[in-house]
């Protein structure tokens, strides 16, 4: 059979020029010759061929060769090391030779053994011999993995094969004096010309064989096998094409990781893998021909056994048929193993002196690529060791039951070599399987022990002698342990034949001594190769049999002894102690062994006295102790699991060797667990696992103290033949010892993990890019978390101090700790002192962070199910509870974990995770899952409740709060999912990277992405999306000059208002200390809505306003910003520079946190807050008369003085009905005296909500809707003057309905200014009394108390306060007495303006029961002070607590108007009131709502309903009122009063916002009905749109228009109907203005008079406006000729502007959970 080769030449330019030339060559035959001792060995070749010796030995390796008589006593481990040298000197390169096999020629390596001479050789041609050195060459299949190539027609150049796999050494072998070193093999430097695939020469290189001389991975070295094998250095004949020099290349050995499935000796044909680290450098290729497993021996002359991995493939590389690959021939266990096809099992007879068969399997192993191996580099040699099959090998193929395949072309090989280039055949397992090989002499002993008359003592002695002197095989181990157990069973029956007790004890003791000696021999190092002949399952089975056999024989002796005695059997590897103790002599624990008995180890086992007493029998306790040496090398643990199922995979998972040439490879090694202590045993019953009530204590010394961790206490399970942890626990451990506690008795030891000697942190797993990305990701997240925390702390004035703010602060703190600890932990190694601390704190931080997320979801749920939806205030008790449960529970869990097993935090490979054990899942995974599921559950419930509420609530504050809660729930849910993704990716990445999984990289980059997104999410959705935070950022940036110029660029935005006043104890002082200016942008705030074209004109118009010269900007609006150029600017300077849009004089904007941030001196003053949007408080005092345009009546309200005394050239028209307002630039601007307060928010048009009254001719819409508007978002709170009711007799219709305007229309009356004069006199008296008070503190205290009483009196609806007493004491007593007489109505809200001051039924309705006006009768003693206490639905108010600042006492008692008209009104109003309130802020619960509905159902039907008069009906009114109608009205009045009393009796709770829609409808109906009745009583038309029948001068009585809360303008709406009436009578001075038209009174009729002036201001007005001066003018003149207005009116206006002071607006939360606001009194 011929082989085809290719000849390739390489040009000077290194271009490959190959000419294929087929030549035939006869492959040399591999031959073996033997010669017995005393005879000649003759070697002869054919003519033309020369002898090439491969290996030789003089001695004996086989018991069958040259043994005609079957002598089994000869040694089979006999070798003369210089046999090959002697034979080469006689036969090398000769055609024939003869050598005498005698001791005189070779020496006597083993006297007493019949020896033989064995030689392996080839007959090669003389031409081949001329190109090589005199070194012997190996067989052709050893020379190369590729076809031979002829260079230049001579010299055979072999294609260098890749390094074959490094076979792993046998694990767990530890010598008694340390680690056994492997004898190094010979290394020969040589040069070679490497040939690449395709015939291209790579160049001349040199390589030196290096064999391992030590271990660098911390594992035990390969075991020493006492087998004599031939050692030969295989050389490759090479020749350089350029220089012609030749050399021999000695192949290096490469050790690989053996991984795969299937146990040793298995025939399953499993594909295994091996890890290869080829030693390749550019331009240099080492020619490798074999892979060696070096096994040293302890006998004379150590040898090395070589395993040649040869791929016998006729086609070379390139075939897809794995059956074409072969394992090379080798020697192992005194047998020659010829080449075997992959997947086949080589079976042959056992070595000489043993019966049975031996087998060894050839498998295909995958070479795992590493850093030095390029899988796709075609310029490198093919990673295979396939060679063509020589013709002479056909017989070998047949001998191995395999067939030889025909050749295939080289081109096919090159195209197909990629598939199998990473695979190569390997013998598996590490050693042949000799389980069925049994020595002949052991068979003889087994037959003897089964005989009836055999002597057990003799058999035991023979067995101990044979095992100490003979080499055993795997089958011999099984037979030996079986004989030991058989002898114990037989002795159990034979001992009864010995009647004498002493004789019985002596015989059993002798038997026990032989058994112990035999067991020690089996554990000896010399028999380690016999253990390796067994597969792992059989090894565990033999070890279990040995332990049980020793225990059975020991208990034979213990049961024989009947008195207290201690028998100790001590041999080389076993210490056995049999103790029989009397219970009465046991005074403490029993300790084994004694310090002087077992010097090999300091292990100790301690049995408590209670455990011994419980297991006593007949007053005696029988104990068997045993300590073993070298048993730890046999009872190897399986990978990760200590049971029989995984024992099969131990070899492939634990035999890990690093490449000797590259000890610092970056490949991750798999987990290795070793037995790191001696095995110690204790038993109280033969073969029984006795459970003890009190555990025993074991102290075990570590065999290896470096690079080991995770000690685990285990015992040997006889049933599973594996180590188990059941019943044992680790008490404590240190570097050298571990203390264990077990509740049963058996064989104990310590298992530990092997750690790589080169400690690596977690970042060693990362590639360069991932390491950088992790740093960047963590840094980004940390920066954004810090920004969020600083935002919450620095801008705390923006936020409500609520539970949600505290929760998010805690979440940010926990996340910051997690990020920093993770960054520190991944840089630490397991040996670092900070490793355990970092893991502990990280555990606590993760648990706390997850708990806070759960509490955040719970808080959202509780907010939706309680009144907290409308009142988001500081909830300190609840937050403290969250703190306790979060941090307290986390610390408790971590403390429990530390108490159970502290080493859990230090046993993991890296310092960011706990060890994955039961404690990890119980204390880490379980709490996190509980918190996570709870958070998801509460979020789901919150979403359901929110959806249900959104369908049942009005578009009021509750609806807005629901929208805010909905947004918070969404953000929190996304936040929770994102954080869970971050932690899950981090966990799976760490676990995967630890096991070197490919998917770990994917998890790593997912962690980087999610962690970065987490930081961005925190910054965007928790900081940037909040409008107030954005505004604070802009302020902060523009106020700090150290920031970059690009960040502090100036922008323009709308002004949010200014503070009026020039100093004073109110807002003005604070305003003067504040900083910043405002500019204008497009906005919808209730300010001037002029366009840009009129900005300059209005700025010039504001120059002459004295009261605003020193006004300072109080705070920026939602879009306002502080100008960087002028950080402190007054209103006047802002108007002059053009950066400030003119605004109403005296308007104040109090924004969220403004007062707090500007250092308000008043305690507790803070502006209302909101979770979204901006809230503004407008203080429209002394508002300037602006140019009025259509749609601006809401903002620019005409004032009383400008109406009464118009400026020259100025005419006032209302509702744009032919009258213009023309204020000259230089003229004094009129001002309005009454005050308007309201909260409002800038309108959002994109919500698609209809603006009320936006059509032409109607009242323009407010920016954000008005009171209880049904078509707009009711988002404002109004504070307006609620005029006190007046009671008295019914006046004739001719009486003036507007007494305030009467003095202007009819100067002789001057009722208003006469009242002012009376109030001034009373005020002077009061000042004299106040001066007698001791101090200002007492004044403030008494005043506050009196004001509180007056406030309760006003809300209780009782009678009016009496006239002021002469001194304060009497005044206070009378107030207290009157308070006791009043009946407090608990259902009052702050908007209950229609409640009567008295509840008596005897007083009828006079002039309307709900009309409010200022002042009372002269003798009624009622107060006329303004009360600013109306708060309606404000969807942004969070209901903070405010300090109370009420009015001055003087103002309360001097602010009455004594007219008979209002005396009669007081009596009329006292009889009834409005039943409903539309402005309650009380959220109300479900129970209260149900009660209210039930109570309403129980109410009888009302007989008094509103008349169905159409608002648009223009029929004339019949002046005659029938008696039936009057009776009907009287009955209705009584019914109304009765219903009010019924409400008081039942104690109805405050109305809830959920009933707002129904209440508003009922209010409209009730108001309409009352209005119609009042019209009948006053003789006025019932139709709203009817024109007034009275003259312009003789004003009719007030029509009793009530305050309606309806916001509609259509039919049924009081406001809409009355607006029509006002529009039709705009020029009529008799037009009436109800309080509900406070913000729309510019459309018709004159404005309200000054109702809020203090006595000082009123006295000034009286001085300026005397009755004599006012007499000269008339109402007609005032209206028709404004140019003739008296000068003192203008002077009074200017003086009034200069003296006006800004005041605080305070609020408090009353007993009905209603926020009530008050105006601060002016300074005395």
UniProtKB/Swiss-Prot annotation:
Ranges of residues in domain SUEL-type lectin: 35-124
A Pfam family annotated for this UniProt entry: SUEL_Lectin
Membrane topology: Multi-pass membrane protein
Subcellular location: Cell membrane
GO molecular function list: carbohydrate binding; G protein-coupled receptor activity; mechanoreceptor activity
Maturation and modification: Proteolytically cleaved into 2 subunits, an extracellular subunit and a seven-transmembrane subunit.
Record topological domains on the Cytoplasmic side: 793-805, 854-879, 946-972, 1022-1724
Composition-biased stretches (Low complexity): 183-197, 237-255, 1315-1333, 1669-1685
Protein name: Latrophilin Cirl
Glycosylation sites: 9, 152, 248, 290, 338, 400, 659, 707, 734
Extent of Acidic residues compositional bias: 1507-1522, 1532-1543
Compositionally biased residues, Pro residues: 159-168
Transmembrane segments: 772-792, 806-826, 833-853, 880-900, 925-945, 973-993, 1001-1021
Taxonomic superkingdom: Eukaryota
The family this protein is said to belong to: Belongs to the G-protein coupled receptor 2 family. LN-TM7 subfamily.
SS bond list: 713-740, 728-742
């Amino acid at each position: 059979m011929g082989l085809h080769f290719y000849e390739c030449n390489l040009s000077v330019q290194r271009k490959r020029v190959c000419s294929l030339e087929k030549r035939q060559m006869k492959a040399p035959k591999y031959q073996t010759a033997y010669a017995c001792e005393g005879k000649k060995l003759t070697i002869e070749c054919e003519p033309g061929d020369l002898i090439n010796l491969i290996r030789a030995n003089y001695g004996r390796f086989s018991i069958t060769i040259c043994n005609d008589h079957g002598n089994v006593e000869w040694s089979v481990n006999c070798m003369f090391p210089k046999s090959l040298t002697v034979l080469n000197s006689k036969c090398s390169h000769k055609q024939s030779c003869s050598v005498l096999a005698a001791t005189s020629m070779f020496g006597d390596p083993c006297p007493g053994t019949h020896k033989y001479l064995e030689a392996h050789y080839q007959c090669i041609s003389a031409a081949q011999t001329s190109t090589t050195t005199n070194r012997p060459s190996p067989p052709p299949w050893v020379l190369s993995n590729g076809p031979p190539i002829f260079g230049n027609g001579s010299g055979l150049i072999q294609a260098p094969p890749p390094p074959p796999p490094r076979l792993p050494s046998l694990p767990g072998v530890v010598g008694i004096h340390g680690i056994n070193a492997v004898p190094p093999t010979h290394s020969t430097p040589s040069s070679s010309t490497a040939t690449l695939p395709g015939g291209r020469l790579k160049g001349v290189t040199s390589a030196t064989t290096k064999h391992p001389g030590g271990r660098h991975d911390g594992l035990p070295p390969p075991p020493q096998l006492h087998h004599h094998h031939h050692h030969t250095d295989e050389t490759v004949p090479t020749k350089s094409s350029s220089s012609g020099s030749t050399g021999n290349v000695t192949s290096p050995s490469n050790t690989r990781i053996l991984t795969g499935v299937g146990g040793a000796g298995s025939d399953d044909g499993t594909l295994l893998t091996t890890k290869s680290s080829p030693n390749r450098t550019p331009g240099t290729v080492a020619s490798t021909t074999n892979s060696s497993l070096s096994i040293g021996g302890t006998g004379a002359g150590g040898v090395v056994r070589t395993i040649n991995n040869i791929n016998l493939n006729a086609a070379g590389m390139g075939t897809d048929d794995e059956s074409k690959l072969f394992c090379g021939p080798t020697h192992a266990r005194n047998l020659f193993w010829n080449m075997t096809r992959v997947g086949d099992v080589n079976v042959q007879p056992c070595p000489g002196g043993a019966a049975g068969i031996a087998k060894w399997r050839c498998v295909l192993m995958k070479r795992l690529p590493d850093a030095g191996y390029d899988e796709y580099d075609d310029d490198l040699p093919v990673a295979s060791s396939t060679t063509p099959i020589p013709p002479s090998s056909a017989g070998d193929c047949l001998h191995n039951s395999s067939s030889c395949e025909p050749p295939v072309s080289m081109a096919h090989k090159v195209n197909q070599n990629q598939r199998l280039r990473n695979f190569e055949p390997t013998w598996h397992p590490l050693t042949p399987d000799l389980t069925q090989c049994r020595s002949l002499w052991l068979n003889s002993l087994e037959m003897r022990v089964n005989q009836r008359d055999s002597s057990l003592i003799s058999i035991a002695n023979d067995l101990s002698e044979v095992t100490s002197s003979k080499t055993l095989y795997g089958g011999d181990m099984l037979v030996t342990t079986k004989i030991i157990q058989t002898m114990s069973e037989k002795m159990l029956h034979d001992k009864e034949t010995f009647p004498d007790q002493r004789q019985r004890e002596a015989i059993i003791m002798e038997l026990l001594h032989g058994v112990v000696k035999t067991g020690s021999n089996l554990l000896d190092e010399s028999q380690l190769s016999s253990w390796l002949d067994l597969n792992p399952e059989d090894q565990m089975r033999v070890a279990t049999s040995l332990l049980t056999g020793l225990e059975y024989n020991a208990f034979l002796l213990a049961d024989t002894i009947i008195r207290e005695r201690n028998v100790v059997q001590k041999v080389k590897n076993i210490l056995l102690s049999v103790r029989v103790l009397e219970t009465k002599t046991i005074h403490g624990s029993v300790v084994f062994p004694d310090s002087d008995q077992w010097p090999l180890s300091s292990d100790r086992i301690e049995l408590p006295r209670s455990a011994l007493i419980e297991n006593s029998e007949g007053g005696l306790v029988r104990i068997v102790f045993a300590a073993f040496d070298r048993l730890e090398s046999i009872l190897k643990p399986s990978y990760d699991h200590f049971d029989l199922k995984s024992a099969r995979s131990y070899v492939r998972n634990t035999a890990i060797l690093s490449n000797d040439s590259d000890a610092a490879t970056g490949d991750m090694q798999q987990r290795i667990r070793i037995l790191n202590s001696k095995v110690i045993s204790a038993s109280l019953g033969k073969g029984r696992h006795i459970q003890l009530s009190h555990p025993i204590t074991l102290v075990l010394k570590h065999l290896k103290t470096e690079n080991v961790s995770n000690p685990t206490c285990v015992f040997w399970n006889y049933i599973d033949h594996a180590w188990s942890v059941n019943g044992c626990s680790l008490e404590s451990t240190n570097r050298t010892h571990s203390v264990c506690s077990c509740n049963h008795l058996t064989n104990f030891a310590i298992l530990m993990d092997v750690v790589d000697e080169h400690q690596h942190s977690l970042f060693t797993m990362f590639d360069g890019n991932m390491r950088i990305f992790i740093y960047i990701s963590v840094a980004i997240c940390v920066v954004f978390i810090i920004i969020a925390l600083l935002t919450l702390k620095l801008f705390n004035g923006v936020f409500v101090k609520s539970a949600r703010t505290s929760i998010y602060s805690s979440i940010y703190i926990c996340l910051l700790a997690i990020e920093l600890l993770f960054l520190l932990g991944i840089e630490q190694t397991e040996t670092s002192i900070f490793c355990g601390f970092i893991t502990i704190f990280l555990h606590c931080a993760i648990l706390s962070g997850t708990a806070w997320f759960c509490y955040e979801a719970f808080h959202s749920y509780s907010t939706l199910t309680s009144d907290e939806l409308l009142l988001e205030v500081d909830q300190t008790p609840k937050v403290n509870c969250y703190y306790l449960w979060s941090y307290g529970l986390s610390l408790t869990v971590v403390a429990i974990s530390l108490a159970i097993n502290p080493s859990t935090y230090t046993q993991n490979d890296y310092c960011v995770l706990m060890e994955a054990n039961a404690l990890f899942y119980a204390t880490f995974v379980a709490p996190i899952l509980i918190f996570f599921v709870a958070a998801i559950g509460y979020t789901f419930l919150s979403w359901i409740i929110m959806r249900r509420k959104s369908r049942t609530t009005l578009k009021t504050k509750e609806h807005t709060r629901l929208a805010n809660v909905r947004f918070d729930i969404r953000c929190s849910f996304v936040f929770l999912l994102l954080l869970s993704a971050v932690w899950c990716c981090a966990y799976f990445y760490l676990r995967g990277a630890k096991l070197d999984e490919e998917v770990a990289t994917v998890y790593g980059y997912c962690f980087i992405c999610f962690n970065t997104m987490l930081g961005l999410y925190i910054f965007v959705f928790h900081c940037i999306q909040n409008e107030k935070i954005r505004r604070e950022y802009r302020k902060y940036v523009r106020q700090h000059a150290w920031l970059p110029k690009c960040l502090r660029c100036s922008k323009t935005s709308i002004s949010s208002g200014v503070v009026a006043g020039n100093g004073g104890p109110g807002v003005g002082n604070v305003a003067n200390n504040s900083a910043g200016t405002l500019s204008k942008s497009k906005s919808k705030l209730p300010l001037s809505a002029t366009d840009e074209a009129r900005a300059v004109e209005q700025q010039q118009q504001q120059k002459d306003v004295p009261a605003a010269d020193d006004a300072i900007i109080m705070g920026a609006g939602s879009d306002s910003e502080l100008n960087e150029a002028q950080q402190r600017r007054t209103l006047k300077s802002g108007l002059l520079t053009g950066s400030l849009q003119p605004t109403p004089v005296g308007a104040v904007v109090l924004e969220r946190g403004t007062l707090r941030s500007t250092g308000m001196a008043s305690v507790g003053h803070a502006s209302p807050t909101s979770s979204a949007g901006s809230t503004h408080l407008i203080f429209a005092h002394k508002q300037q008369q602006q140019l009025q345009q259509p749609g601006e009546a809401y903002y620019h309200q005409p004032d009383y003085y400008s109406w009464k005394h118009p400026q020259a050239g100025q005419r006032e028209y209302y509702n744009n009905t032919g009258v213009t307002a023309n204020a000259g630039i230089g003229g004094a601007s009129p001002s309005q005296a009454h005050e308007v307060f309201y909260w409002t928010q800038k309108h959002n048009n994109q919500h698609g909500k209809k603006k009320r009254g936006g059509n032409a001719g109607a009242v323009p819409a407010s920016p954000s809707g008005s009171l209880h508007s049904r078509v707009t978002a009711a988002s404002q709170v109004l504070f307006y003057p609620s005029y006190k009711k007046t009671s008295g007799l019914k006046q004739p219709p001719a009486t003036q309905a507007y007494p305030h305007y009467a003095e202007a229309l009819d100067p002789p009356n001057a009722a208003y200014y006469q009242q002012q004069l009376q109030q001034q006199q009373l005020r002077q008296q009061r000042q004299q009394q106040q001066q007698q008070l001791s101090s200002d503190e007492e004044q403030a205290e008494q005043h506050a108390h009196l004001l509180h009483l007056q406030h309760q009196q006003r809300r209780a609806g009782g009678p009016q306060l009496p006239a002021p007493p002469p001194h304060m004491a009497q005044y206070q007593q009378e107030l207290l007495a009157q308070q006791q007489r009043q009946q407090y109505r608990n259902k009052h809200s702050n908007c209950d303006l229609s409640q009567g001051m008295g509840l008596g039924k005897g007083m009828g309705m006079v002039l309307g029961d709900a009309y409010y006006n200022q002042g009372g009768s002269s003798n009624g003693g009622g107060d006329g002070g303004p009360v600013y206490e109306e708060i309606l639905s404000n969807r942004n108010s969070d209901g903070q607590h405010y300090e109370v600042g009420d009015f001055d006492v003087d103002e309360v008692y001097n602010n009455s108007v004594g007219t008979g008209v209002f005396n009669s009104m007081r009596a009329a109003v006292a009889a009834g009131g409005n039943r409903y309130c539309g402005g309650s802020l009380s959220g109300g619960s479900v129970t209260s709502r149900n009660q209210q509905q039930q109570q309403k159902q129980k109410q009888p039907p009302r007989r008094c309903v509103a008349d169905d008069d159409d608002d648009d009906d223009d029929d004339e009114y019949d002046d005659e009122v029938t008696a039936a109608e009057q009776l009907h009205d009287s009955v209705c009045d009584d019914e109304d009063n009765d219903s009010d009393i019924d409400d008081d009796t039942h104690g109805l709770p405050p109305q809830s916002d959920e009933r707002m829609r129904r209440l508003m409808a009922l209010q409209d109906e009730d108001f309409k009905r009352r209005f119609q009745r009042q019209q009948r009583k006053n003789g006025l038309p019932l139709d709203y749109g009817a024109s007034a029948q009275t003259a312009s001068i003789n004003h009719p009585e007030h029509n009793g228009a009530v305050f309606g809360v309806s916001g509609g303008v259509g039919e049924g709406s009081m406001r809409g109907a009355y607006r029509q009436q006002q529009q039709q009578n705009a020029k009529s001075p008799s037009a009436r203005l109800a309080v509900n038209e406070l913000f729309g009174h510019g459309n018709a009729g004159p404005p309200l008079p000054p109702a809020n002036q203090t006595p000082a201001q009123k006295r000034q007005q009286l001085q300026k406006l005397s009755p004599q001066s006012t007499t000269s003018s008339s109402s007609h003149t005032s209206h028709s000729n404004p140019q003739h207005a008296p000068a003192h009116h203008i002077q009074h206006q200017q003086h009034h502007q200069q003296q006006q002071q800004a005041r605080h607006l305070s609020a408090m939360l009353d007993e009905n959970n209603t926020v009530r606001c008050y105006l601060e009194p002016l300074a005395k």
